[in-house]
Amino acid sequence: MAACIKGIFKRYIFKSDSGYVIGLFKVKETNNNDLDDFIDHTITFTGYFHELTLDDTYLFNGSLVEHEKYGRQFQVDSYERVLPEEKDATIEFLSSGLFKGIGEKTAEKIVSYLGKDTLTTILENPSNLLLIPGITNKQINILNKTLTEYEASYRTIVSLGELGFSTRDSLLIYNKYKEKTTTILNDNIYLFYEDILEITFKKVDTIAIKSGLLPNDIRRIEAAILYAINEVCNLLGHSYLFKEEIMNYVVRILGERITIEEFNSALVELEKDSKIIRINEKYYLTAMYEAERNISRRCGYLMRIPDIISKKLDSTIASVEKHFDCFYNQDQLNAIKLSYTKNILVVTGGPGTGKTTIIKAICELYKEINKLSYEKLTEQIALLAPTGRASKRISESTNLPACTIHRFLKWNKENNKFAINEYHKSDVSFVIVDEFSMVDTYLFDSLLKGLRYDTKLVLVGDYNQLPSVGPGEILKDMIESNSLNVVSLKELYRQKENSNIISLAYQINDNQIDEAIFNQKEDLIFIPTPVNHVTDKILEIAREDTSHTMQVLAPMYKTLNGIDMINHSLQEVYNPKSKNKKELVINGVIFRENDKVIQLSNMPDENVFNGDIGIITEIYNGSKKEIYIDFDGNTVRYTPANFQKFKHAYAISIHKSQGSEFDTVLIPLVNQYGKMLYRKLIYTAVTRAKKKLYLVGEISALEKAIQNNDVNLRRTTLKEMLIENIKNV
């Protein structure tokens, strides 16, 4: 039997936009002996709530739990408002401020006329209020409307819970649709999936079928089509799918046979409702099609803005060269000039070609030619990158502030929306985005919407690296469209032409490996190793790494030579068990003080982002369990609620490493990795190494990866749209 407590809500301790609440509750009654000590005292409670009114009476159902830090708390599973029954309580309730225009004297008059069942009487027969002298029609409407709204909302939330939605999901649904919730539920329950990011198709589908919906209901097929297109495009990076593909995925998702007529009818309805767009047998989610179209149109607009002319341009660039004590090659000079004269510029190049040097020069040129102070420069220019580590790296290189695109757009993790958007644009005049190959279509569309139409853009990246995790391949499409201002940096910058690491990167990209590369060199060491001895060889090299700066980059987590196994082994080399180091086991994995870990998701409130690497400084493993991680001077506290947001980082995935650089990199290469061996992946891994690179494993695996350049070719239409929108510029 669930425990229940009846009492008064006293105050909020914490309240999130998602409806999660921590608060104080004064207990008056309980059905649980363990809670008797709290009668006439307050207890801390947690749970998801629609709305709570201070000093109102509620009935909470749930359980008494022991929090590792804060002691006994009541975890609320469901709740209901208790309408006051006593005369004084009813007067207090009606005059609480919840009912606008109803003061204490008016409340006393109402209760005096209607008696102890005042609230029930108002709900069931509001016309009785007309019998009370001095009560206005406006007050009657307020009383009836407010009581009805509150009663309806609670009944709706409870009914959603009875169907199988969690309290959190029920609140998300009600907060989205309010009084229309029941209508939407009856008309098309699948709109809950379509409209609310946190609610999954599978959850809604399970509840719909359980509630008696026919397996071939057109509303179900429509939702499955939207789910299929979204999931597959996110997985493979496509902008669109073909009809036959969608049909196959939908049948797999629904686990039912549907006729081609039923499928076609659903497609037609989705087109009519503008939820999908069909162009020449290509089927897009409307949001994706509009994102590509917006990007192409904005690029076209920027290309049409007249060039900026300045007689001081050449002399100012010469001044910039003097400032940095360097001379730029012709490609670099071209990029620097175009960054000023043009309103959109793409700069691409491989490792060692001076992309970061160009960004520094562009910023300095903009400052000097516009006669800006450092403070004014930072107000007018925004240096952005897709990841926290990449933004930190560009900030260190330029001595200017930089941040992630999400941070710049003021991403709200509660509703997954940006505060900087088409309705509230940023005031910056110039935006430079580094590591642009990692930016997906939706994110770039959001960035453009958050900028003024005349904001200058410089986009910098290496399009031979891995594309974005999300859909699209924007940098590649922009370059291959031949429609934009593009500068390709080819000449190796300064002394880096002597780097064997960079030579290997270019050989990989050209699919022409020189056998001499397998001879051991100072900065590049290939160690042929049988598959069963790769991890042992990694440990051997790690024991010689006295500086503890080596970073292992691997393609996948599982298998004998996967990231998880390598991390387990390397922990004992770099951070062995010690009586002086406290430990904590999380999901079967031991974490100890001084462990190197990687952040797996964004925590913008803590200024820590996906891919950031830190060191565990403190662990508390007593009645309270906490882990403190230092990210380059920013110490973040983790509790059990977010322990899943980090992993060991002695070995990390190549995808997670993108946007970062390491002095020493070790890449295990075994045929065991299968489909994860492909050119762009290995090229990206190799280009993470600054000073030293180890390749450990099978030569045949390296050769297989280099020859495999056809993995997951992405289907997009941005290239064609750019050509169409810019053809007459």
What is each of the regions a protein language model found here?
Residues V347, L383:
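Hydrophobic anchor at the beta1->P-loop junction of P-loop NTPases
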Residues D612-V729:
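C-terminal accessory regions
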Residues K355, Y374, Y463-E606, T617:
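Conserved helicase motor core of P-loop NTPases
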Residues M1-K311:
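Accessory, non-ATPase domains that flank or precede helicase/AAA+ motor cores in DNA-metabolism machines
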Residues S339, G350, P386:
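P-loop (Walker A) phosphate-binding loop of NTP-binding proteins
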Residues L365-Q380:
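Post-Walker A helix-loop "phosphate-sensing" segment adjacent to the P-loop in P-loop NTPases
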Residues V346, T357, A361, L365, ...:
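Conserved helicase motor core of SF1/SF2 NTP-dependent helicases
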Residues D325-T341:
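N-terminal pre-P-loop "Q-motif" helix
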